[in-house]
Regions:
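A short, Lys/Arg-enriched amphipathic alpha-helix followed by its capping loop at the start of a domain
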Residues: 2-7, 291
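Aromatic-lined carbohydrate-recognition surfaces of secreted/lumenal glycan-active proteins
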Residues: 103-108, 129-170, 182-187, 212-223, ...
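Aromatic- and acid-rich polysaccharide-binding/catalytic face
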Residues: 10-14, 58-64, 91, 98-102, ...
Length: 334
């Protein structure tokens, strides 16, 4: 499917601490080098790149959630910090990862992963700033030593417009603005209201003065969809051969079964269900697209396809509707 599409960017995502670091009593105590070198998703990522060739560029996002550890962000120069860098370097050398990526993103939504309290305002901002600066400098040294050419981005900041008091956001932005080794900033825009598609970009450019490149490796309206997963089909259901009391998640389970059996519902029916609800953000993909163009977004990645037998085999009233953000809906429409 990727070969037949016009996709130009593919993003990979790896959680460094969960997969590749040893953790004892809230401390990073070592690196699982064998786990890195035998990590099957890494191999598949590289195989996909080689199959697609130069036509498609790959992005690697490194998730480093410090909230897993009691001391949040380790100090630069400590053994804990060095283990993080060691694991990253081994990963980049495994299967020639570094030679096959165009962009490396340091971090993933650090507002959530570096918070000291539940209001997401207070964080170990200065230590996180120091970490990112050191990380960018280490990556640059490795690039020079190994002939690697990927660009370094910081991020990925999420809900910037909703967290005006965050200590993490200005820390990340300062690294982007002041470290010459950092090419740009990654934004994740998971909007609750459609106007928020632009809010984060505008604030980053206007309030924080970021002039470097922007990319967006995640975007969705999942937060607008989740509260309605158990809504009834209502009059639409009656008109289309279902019961008025059937829930959206029940409908999704049913049409997934139909698609799997080779008798999928039509795309017209599928689309008309959501457009029958006043809460549904109509044309949200188009809205995001216009925002990306307006802010000259260098690279955008999102959910490409929803395939049968995905991570959420059966939906229920608590299922988060990430899969409704795909471009193709093989799971629902065959």
């Amino acid at each position: 499917m990727l070969k037949q599409s016009k996709v130009s960017w593919v993003r990979g995502f790896v959680n460094i601490p969960n997969l590749f670091l040893q953790n004892e009593n809230g401390k990073i105590v070592g690196v699982k080098e064998n786990a890195i070198r035998t990590h099957i998703p890494t191999l598949k990522f590289i195989q996909a790149k080689k199959a697609l060739g130069d036509r498609v560029k790959f992005i690697l996002s490194l998730k480093i959630p410090f909230e897993l550890y009691t001391d949040t962000v380790p100090k630069v120069g400590t053994k804990e910090m060095e283990y993080i860098f060691q694991a990253t370097e081994v990963l980049l050398k495994t299967y020639d990862m570094a030679k096959n990526i165009e962009i490396l993103v340091m971090g993933n939504e650090p507002e959530w992963e570096n918070a000291l309290d539940t209001d997401l305002c207070h964080a170990d901002g200065e230590d996180y700033r120091a970490f990112l600066n050191e990380f960018a400098n280490r990556l640059t040294a490795w690039k020079q030593a190994n002939g690697w050419t990927f660009d370094i981005y910081a991020g990925a900041l999420n809900r910037v417009s909703e967290l005006p008091k965050s200590e993490t956001v200005p820390a990340v932005v300062s690294v982007v603005n002041n470290n010459p080794n950092v090419v740009g900033l990654d934004l994740h825009v998971h909007a609750l209201k459609i106007n928020q598609a632009e809010d984060d970009f505008r604030i980053i450019r206007d309030k924080y003065g970021v002039t470097k490149k922007l990319i967006c490796t995640e975007f969705s309206m999942v937060r607008a969809l989740n509260p309605h997963v158990a809504d009834a089909l209502g009059e639409w259901g009656t008109k289309h051969g279902y019961t008025a009391g059937m829930k959206i998640y029940e409908y999704l389970n049913l049409i997934a079964e139909k698609a799997n059996a080779g008798t999928p519902v039509s795309a017209t029916e599928f689309k008309s269900l959501f457009e029958s609800y006043s809460w549904y953000p109509k044309n949200w993909y188009k809205t995001f697209y216009e925002v990306f163009k307006k802010y000259d977004t260098y690279a955008i990645t999102g959910r490409f396809s929803v395939v049968p037998g995905g991570a959420r085999a059966v939906y229920d009233a608590k299922t988060e509707m990430w899969e409704l953000g795909g471009i193709y809906f093989s799971r629902y429409l065959g």
